[in-house]
Amino acid sequence: MGEIMNKLKFVFSAIVFSAGLVITTLAQAETIKIGVSFRMLSDVGYKHGELITDTVAKWNKEGTINGQKIDLTLYNDECKSEKGVANATKLAYQDKVHVIIGSSCSSVTLPMVPVSAKAKVPQIIPHSTNADITKKGSEYIFRVPVSSRFYKIVQGKFTAE
């Protein structure tokens, strides 16, 4: 279990660091605002939320990104598309975040993409693999995992062998 948590910490640190790099070129504010919309209905989901919150708190305590503190806003989308769209809208227009991270469900991420693109807020997608996410073609959308089309090919080959 410890090895899995270490890997999760690394992944979330990389995601938050990537968000910082994207933001640094976009925002010269004193505080970097990061908005997150994840499915947090299970122990694993809650752990993801705690992990990213703890990572940001640690960075704010020990150091910053280019001297800028990080302000984290975390919402639970419950893997429901209407909540994801509401979260993305709130993050972009009300909370005025510099970057959105999420969602962890492709069915939620797909309808969030047009919201981020229209608001011109970069969106980093750490989990969703649906190929249509990046097919929508926005310069503001960055998907971390490989497309599900690739996984299907690999799984098919593995099954055949």
Where are these regions (language model features)?
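Immediate post-signal peptide segment of exported/extracytoplasmic ligand-binding proteins
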Residues: 26-37, 64-71, 160-161
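Bacterial N-terminal signal peptides that target proteins for export
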Residues: 3-15
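Extracytoplasmic "Venus flytrap"
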Residues: 35-53, 75-82, 104-105
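Extracytoplasmic ligand/sensor domains, especially the bilobed periplasmic-binding protein
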Residues: 82, 96-161
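Bacterial N-terminal signal peptides
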Residues: 13-24
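Signal peptide-proximal N-terminal region
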Residues: 50-72
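Structural motif
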Residues: 69-94, 149-154
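Short, Lys/Arg-enriched N-terminal segments with co-localized hydrophobic residues
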Residues: 1-4, 25
